[in-house]
Swiss-Prot record:
This is Aspartate--tRNA ligase. ATP binds at R217, D218, E219, Q226, E482, G534, L535, D536, R537. It catalyses: tRNA(Asp) + L-aspartate + ATP = L-aspartyl-tRNA(Asp) + AMP + diphosphate. It is an enzyme of class 6 (ligase). Keywords: Aminoacyl-tRNA synthetase, ATP-binding, Cytoplasm, Ligase, Nucleotide-binding, Protein biosynthesis. NCBIfam families: aspS_bact, PRK00476.1. Gene3D superfamilies: Bira Bifunctional Protein, Domain 2, GAD-like domain, Nucleic acid-binding proteins. It is found in: Cytoplasm. The gene is aspS.
Length: 598
């Protein structure tokens, strides 16, 4: 039906007759002449209708935005004065000879001339995706997946599919369950990741595996999370953690060079402990120059219990953030930052404004100045490298509260005061995570997942002191986003059972949930390691949006609903009966639909 795409026409096509298919993006009547901007997935081109071409001109007078059309015409160069440098096709236009209206459009529920609500955009997603910026994001996504497949193929990885209908295993989030019609009362689970299957593939001898795969997690959503998401899943045998990181870093560096024309350079490696200490986050945004500085040793003897209490507590922390030029902040702004960190459990935000260091205590403004002596103030200013015109913000509480609160405050200050370099890329690897963390109920939970191997420990040593264990795990972080995470896996049955026991999984539960894995570990399992990238998050970064829904064709809302198809919906009673399922509903919203299931 067509010979060319609209957005690919240029001066090399001048004089050629072309047939185009697409939509009317805009129509203009100029004193008896009709112009339209015609759009397809590749972009826009201007079309001119001459009154002398009566049939085409008459039809053109009927055109409205979003009519689907086909036209034939000749490409001609625009006069020098009419070249549009803002359009890729701005040097040419089409002189239309023939026009066909393929399909007319009703008045649109979305307004292209204003910002539409996200609810409207999701409800009419098929119209929203016609917008050039949305089309470009999905084209970039396709470019990324094609690039990844080529890279993985060139490096000897095999693309192997794993099951979508599988067994529920504890991986941190709730599973989406699928009832079995054949096996009454039993359920499949949609995979949260292909973790165990890719490990089994290593045990099968496939050596290098990858897959671009859908994963499902029934968890609370954020702007960068969806109930169904896509991973670039990777696993290798006989490769160490540094070797895995080397290949995956090469993939990402070459991807950024291909898509953005940016060389990311070598990725620095930072331990979890350093990241938390300096930045208050295990995914630090290194574009932001602010850092947390420990000062507990300097205020242990201060006559101010808010500081001295945590400073003398083994589980406490006192830290400061120096904000260059922050002495200009008003009391109202400072109070707002104090309220902000209350979200993270902080009880207040102490500060010191440094107006003129040469004046000592007389040169600062601070509600805690009366508790300081000259030597203590000087030590704090030296430790934080404070300069005249700066402000120091302090956190003093448990180590967790201070780290979380100041880590979040650091990011907010970076945004509010334009300290974060938005036009730069700062990747790194974060390594040496704790193997376990407290689960809030007196037990331990795996910080990554229960199949991660510890570093340099025997099963007996791990069982004796699990809290001290360091996981052989690694996360790739870019601009404060965790884009990928992985680890060396456990390839020893005794070690795997030890980890299960530490997590409170009984031997009976181990056999019921992981018997197939424990059996497989008996038969010459190779050492193996891997990683998974969040494809949606990678595309989000590479397209410059901060919302993952912008890079998924048909995403869900933060309530895990599809406004376009109205999923999820109540099931047909006959289907439920066939599955031998009775639905018990709770709450008014569910009660309103209960009759549909009875």
């Amino acid at each position: 039906m067509r010979t060319n795409y609209c957005g690919q026409l240029n001066s090399s096509h001048v004089g050629q007759e072309v047939t185009l298919c697409g939509w009317v993006n805009r129509r203009r009547d100029l004193g008896g002449l009709i112009f339209i901007d015609m759009r397809d997935r590749e972009g826009l081109v201007q079309v001119f209708f001459d009154p002398d071409r009566q049939d085409a001109f008459k039809l053109a007078s009927e055109l409205r935005n979003e009519f689907c059309i086909q036209l034939t015409g000749v490409v001609r160069a625009r006069p020098e004065s009419q070249i549009n440098k803002d359009m890729a096709t701005g040097e040419v236009e089409i002189f239309a000879n023939a026009l066909t209206i393929v399909n007319r459009s009703e008045a649109l529920p979305l307004d292209s001339n204003q910002t539409n609500t996200e609810e409207a955009r999701l409800k009419y997603r098929y119209l929203d995706l016609r917008r050039p910026e949305m089309a470009q994001r999905l084209k970039t996504r396709a470019r990324i997946t094609s690039f990844v497949r080529r890279f993985m193929d060139e490096h000897g990885f095999l693309d192997i599919e794993t099951p979508m209908l599988t067994k529920a295993t504890p991986e941190g989030a709730r599973d989406y369950l699928v009832p079995s019609r054949v096996h009454k009362g039993k359920f499949y689970a949609l995979p949260q990741s292909p973790q165990l299957f890719k490990q089994l593939l290593m045990m099968s001898g496939f050596d290098r595996y990858y897959q671009i795969v859908k994963c499902f997690r029934d968890e609370d959503l954020r702007a960068d999370r969806q109930p169904e998401f896509t991973q670039i899943d990777v696993e290798t045998s006989f490769m160490t953690a540094p070797q895995v990181r080397e290949v995956m870093e090469k993939l990402v560096r070459e991807l950024w060079l291909d898509v953005k024309g940016v060389d990311l350079g070598d990725f620095p490696i930072m331990t979890f402990a350093e990241a938390m200490r300096r930045f208050g986050s295990d995914k630090p945004d290194l574009r932001n120059p602010l850092e947390l500085v420990d000062v507990a040793d300097l205020v242990k003897n201060i006559d101010f219990k808010v500081f001295s209490g945590p400073a003398n507590d083994a589980k406490g922390r006192v830290a400061a953030i120096r904000v260059p030029g922050g002495a200009q902040l008003s009391r109202k702004q400072i109070d707002e930052y104090g309220k902000f960190i209350e979200i993270y459990g902080a009880k207040g935000l102490a500060y010191i404004k440094l107006n003129e260091r040469a004046k000592g205590l007389e040169g600062v403004q601070s509600p805690v100045a009366k508790f300081l002596n000259a030597d203590m103030l000087s030590a704090l200013l030296d430790r934080t490298a404070a300069q005249d015109g700066d402000i120091l913000f302090f956190g003093a509480d448990s180590a967790k509260v201070v780290t979380d609160a100041l880590g979040a405050l650091r990011l907010k200050l970076g945004r509010d005061l334009s300290l974060t370099k938005d036009d730069s890329w700062e990747p790194l690897w974060v390594v040496d995570f704790p193997m376990f963390e407290e689960d809030g109920e007196g037990g331990l939970a795996a910080m990554h997942h229960p199949f991660t191997a510890p570093r340099d420990m025997l099963p007996s040593e791990l069982a004796a002191n699990p809290v001290s264990a360091i996981a052989n795990a690694y996360d790739m972080v870019i601009n404060g986003y965790e884009v990928g995470g992985g680890s060396v896996r456990i390839h020893n049955g005794d070690m795997q059972q030890t980890v299960f026991s530490i997590l409170g999984i009984t031997e009976q539960e181990q056999r019921e949930k992981f018997g197939f894995l424990l059996d497989a570990l008996k038969y010459g399992t190779p050492p193996h390691a891997g990683l998974a990238f969040g494809l949606d998050r990678l595309v989000m970064l590479l397209t410059g949006t901060d919302n993952i829904r912008d890079v998924i064709a048909f995403p869900k809302t933060t309530a895990a609903a599809c406004l376009m198809t109205e999923a999820p919906s109540f099931a047909n009673p006959a289907s439920l009966e066939e599955l031998a399922i009775a639905v018990v509903v709770k709450g008014k919203a569910a009660q309103d639909g209960k009759s549909e299931n009875e």
